[in-house]
Regions:
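Structural core segment of the AMP-binding/adenylate-forming
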Residues: 84-162, 544, 550
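Conserved C-terminal "lid"/linker of ANL adenylate-forming enzymes
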Residues: 496-499, 549-605
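Conserved ATP-dependent adenylate/AMP-binding module captured primarily in the ANL superfamily
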Residues: 96-126, 212-229, 260-274, 346
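Conserved AMP-binding A3 loop
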Residues: 37-41, 157, 179-180, 187-213
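Conserved AMP-binding/adenylation subdomain of ANL enzymes
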Residues: 210-227, 234-340, 351
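Conserved pre-ATP/AMP-binding loop-to-beta segment of ANL
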Residues: 22-25, 139, 153-154, 161-191, ...
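Conserved AMP-binding/adenylate-forming core of the ANL superfamily
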Residues: 6, 26-80, 97-102, 152-160, ...
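Conserved ATP-binding/catalytic segment of the ANL
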Residues: 406-473, 490
Length: 605
């Protein structure tokens, strides 16, 4: 039975944290440039009123409540309010289109829906006639909606007031609901963003997440004194795992960004002590440094070159768990004082004990770069279907390029087809309303991940690629596209790429350029353009990307090299169907939508 501090449910643990930590800071939220603090007592009171407000509106145990919002305190108050009152929370990405919202509400059977603001409300209202289970909509930010007159809608403040009154009339109701929580209760629905097919709702129980809290604590150690930056979407399992549940386990402080656009500045201001991010964030940081170097003086570039080489040499000893010679430590101290520390401060990671990455493939060279800067980065691996992570690189047991060994309590093995299989108390109950998909994915207690991998003699797991993404060329050669794509994304000028070549005579790729860095390149080199599309079609940008691809080709065998490429000349954001909410290109959608562009690279052979 999974427990945290003697608590067998998340509601019981939340009640304990509120009682024990009281006036200590639990959350900070940036609003108009000011960081406002909220104590554990504040957190507990608002979650209590939110949960009891829903009870006053008729919510029953097991009812699904969906939340569509950017990362903010109301998301967290509503989340734990729903869970403690016996409901089930389901995160909706604020970038989802009305049709996606309709699907999620109907598939989950949502009765109560939290909308961040007018924009999120409008998306739901556009489809509400086709969402028969929906009963009430709660709005966090009423800006522009003060004159809204709709019996289905109420403000979050109104919900809290209803909860306050309900608490006064039923003084024992909150504790009664918390005491009713059982380890096997469904607590969270997390819909996989997925690169193919409609999203599937992973059913995460109380015990699933308690197990994951224990795993994260045993792997990394997070404490009350630690600071996190909350910026990842809470509809994603990683955001929930760190900002709701790991914070609850550890008592650490979560600092919520003002908006996605202010994330980089907020990171510098908060200077967190522990920091998890997806590869795209790390790639963007690396790219920003590379671009600044191009604009630096010759002396500045020389100083960086010397400093990073010293950092790389020192990192070799650290990664080998070997003693660093005194002369090298002295050289690193000088390099750190003059160059590397300033880079870390500029990125906002100088105070971090460790950095962690997951949710997509990452180039090992990028991890090496952070080690050279003086910050260890550890790659972990898991899926929504195992409630978080199943393998991890640890401070005293890691191998760069791998995703680490099985975490405590988890088992990892390979099938006859080299598919990675996971068995652990974190594996979900199944997919909501999809027994056939559940039976396909979870067989004999083993989660079939859909990832091809290998496991070395010491137990380190290596993820090769998604099984469905392996390319078999017309010549019969098996190609791992993600390995090539990771190297392409290491370029400061490439945000993402999709390698194509299944049953084709050679490999090609579609490239999504880094708009900011390529625009800077064009301005620095006097390249005329009028918009993003025209920028992509300039000869200079085409040559720039061709040069980047040639550099990557030099690292691979001839059959694995990119022969032709095309640029995706539309500026994409997470609201576009080509991108997942974590900013990964959806391979299937890209292949279908840009079929003519792909075919053009094979005409004439």
């Amino acid at each position: 039975m999974c427990e945290v501090d003697g608590c067998r449910s998340v509601p019981a643990l939340f009640r304990r944290r509120v009682a024990d930590l009281g006036e200590k800071v639990a959350l900070r939220e940036k609003d108009f440039g000011i960081w406002n603090e909220y104590s554990w007592a504040d957190y507990g009171q608002r979650a209590r009123w939110a949960g009891l407000g829903l009870k006053a509106l008729g919510m029953e145990r097991g009812d699904v409540c969906s939340i569509a919002s950017e990362v903010n305190k109301e998301w967290l108050f509503a989340d734990l309010g729903v869970i403690c009152a016996g409901g089930v929370t389901n995160g909706v990405y604020p970038t989802d289109a009305p049709e996606q919202v309709e699907y999620l509400v109907n598939d989950s059977g949502t009765r109560f829906y939290f909308a961040e603001d007018e924009e999120q409300l409008d998306k739901l209202l556009a489809v509400r006639e086709r969402t028969p289970t929906l009963e009430k909509i709660v709005i966090f930010d009423m800006k522009g909606l003060r004159h809204l007159d709709d019996p289905m809608c109420l403000s979050f403040d109104d919900l809290l007031e209803r909860g306050r009154k309900y608490a006064a009339e039923h003084p024992g109701a909150w504790d009664e609901e918390i005491d009713r929580a059982q380890p096997g209760d469904l607590m969270v629905l997390t819909y996989t963003s997925g690169t193919t097919g409609p999203p599937k709702g992973s059913m995460i129980t109380q015990s699933n997440m308690l197990f994951m809290m224990n795993v994260l604590q045993r792997c990394y150690g997070v404490f009350e004194s630690d600071e996190q930056l909350g910026f990842l979407p809470l509809a994603h399992v990683a955001g929930r795992m760190f900002y709701t549940f790991l914070a609850l386990e550890s008592g650490s402080v979560v600092n919520l960004t003002e908006s996605p656009e202010t994330m980089e500045q907020d990171l510098r201001e908060v200077a967190p002590s522990v920091h998890f991010a997806v590869p795209r964030v790390w790639e963007k940081q690396h790219s920003s440094v590379q671009i600044k170097l191009k604009e630096a003086t010759a002396l500045g570039r020389w100083a960086y070159s010397v400093a990073i080489r010293v950092g790389e040499r020192r990192a070799e000893f650290l990664k080998a768990r070997a003693h660093v010679p005194g002369w090298l430590e002295a050289a690193f101290a000088a390099a750190d004082r003059l160059v590397l520390r300033n880079i870390r401060r500029g990125l906002g990671i100088d105070s971090c004990r460790w950095l962690s990455t997951a949710a997509a493939p990452i180039a090992p060279e990028l991890i090496d770069w952070y080690w050279a800067l003086g910050k260890p980065m550890y790659e972990v691996y898991g899926q929504t279907e195992c409630s978080g992570i199943a393998t991890a690189n640890l401070a005293d047991d890691f191998r760069i390029g791998s995703v680490g060994k099985a975490t405590p309590g988890a088992e990892v093995r390979l099938s006859d087809q080299d598919e990675i299989l996971i068995r652990s108390p974190g594996v979900i109950q199944g997919y909501w309303n999809k027994p056939e998909k559940t039976a396909e994915t979870i067989r004999g207690d083993w989660l079939h991940t859909g990832d091809v991998g290998r496991i070395d003699a010491e137990g380190f797991v290596y993820v090769v690629d998604r099984m469905k993404d392996i390319i078999i060329t017309a010549g019969g050669k098996n190609i791992t596209p993600s390995e090539i794509e990771n190297q392409l994304k290491f370029s400061a000028y490439i945000t993402d790429a999709v390698v194509v070549g299944d049953r084709r005579p050679y490999l090609t790729c579609l490239v999504m350029i880094d708009a900011e860095n390529v625009t800077q390149f064009a301005q620095d080199n006097g390249v005329p353009f009028t918009n993003y599309t025209s920028l992509c079609h300039t000869r200079e940008v085409q040559d720039l990307i061709a040069s980047e691809i040639e550099s990557v080709n030099a690292k691979f065998a001839r059959v694995e090299t990119i022969k032709k490429f095309r640029l995706i000349d539309q500026l994409l954001d997470p609201e576009d169907e080509e991108l997942t909410p974590t900013q990964k290109l959806k391979r299937k959608v890209v292949n279908e939508k840009y079929a003519d562009l792909i075919d053009s690279m094979y005409r004439g052979g």
